[in-house]
C-alpha cells in the first residue's frame, strides 16, 4: 500500500512539473518576440500592462505553490492514516470520546454490581431467610415419576429449589468482603 501512495505522489509531482514546463515554454516564446521600435517604452499603458502581467504571473505561481502544498499534505495524510492502523491521527487520540453505547454498557455494569451488593447485604441481614421444606418431602418429590417412567418437570423444579437453598445457606454462612 505504501508503494501505491508513493507512486501517486510521484505522479502528482510529475504532472505538476509538466504543467510548469509548458507554461514556462509559453512565456519564453512570448518574450522572444522583439518589441517594435516604434512603440515608446515609457508609455503609461505599456507599464500598466507589464504590471498586470507580473501580478498575474505572481498569482499564478502562488496558486501553483498552494496546489502543490495541498497535494503534499494530502499524500502525507494518506501515509499517516496508513501508519495508524485504526485510521485515527495521533493528535486526535487525546480527544477521542467513548461511544454512547460503551458509556451505557459501563453504567449498566456498574448498576448491576451495585444491585448485587445490595442483594447480598439484604441476605446477610437476615431478611431473605425463609423456611424450606424438610428433606423428607424433597426426597418424596424426587421419587415421583410420570406414568411413562420419565422424570417430570417437577424434578427440575426440585433440583432448582435445592440449588437455591444451598446457595442461600452458603451466602448466609460465608463472610462477605467488600471486593464485590
Swiss-Prot record:
Instruction: Give positions of region: Disordered.
Output: 25-59
- Domain of life, per UniProt, equals Eukaryota
Which compartment or compartments is the protein found in?
Answer: Secreted
> Which keywords annotate this record?
Amidation, Cleavage on pair of basic residues, Hormone, Phosphoprotein, Secreted, Signal
Q: Which Pfam families match?
A: Hormone_2
The record's account of tissue expression is:
Glucagon is secreted in the A cells of the islets of Langerhans. GLP-1, GLP-2, oxyntomodulin and glicentin are secreted from enteroendocrine cells throughout the gastrointestinal tract. GLP-1 and GLP-2 are also secreted in selected neurons in the brain.
Q: Does the keyword Signal apply?
A: yes
Q: According to the record, what induces this protein's expression? A: Glucagon release is stimulated by hypoglycemia and inhibited by hyperglycemia, insulin, and somatostatin. GLP-1 and GLP-2 are induced in response to nutrient ingestion.
Q: Which residues carry this modification: Arginine amide?
A: 127
Residue numbers carrying Phosphoserine: 54, 105, 108, 150, 152
PROSITE patterns reported for this sequence: GLUCAGON (PS00260)
Q: Which family does it belong to?
A: Belongs to the glucagon family.
Further details from the record: GLP-2 does not have cleavage on a pair of basic residues at C-terminus as in other mammals.
What is the name attached to this protein's record?
Pro-glucagon
Q: Which organism is it from?
A: Sus scrofa
Organism phylogeny: Eukaryota, Metazoa, Chordata, Craniata, Vertebrata
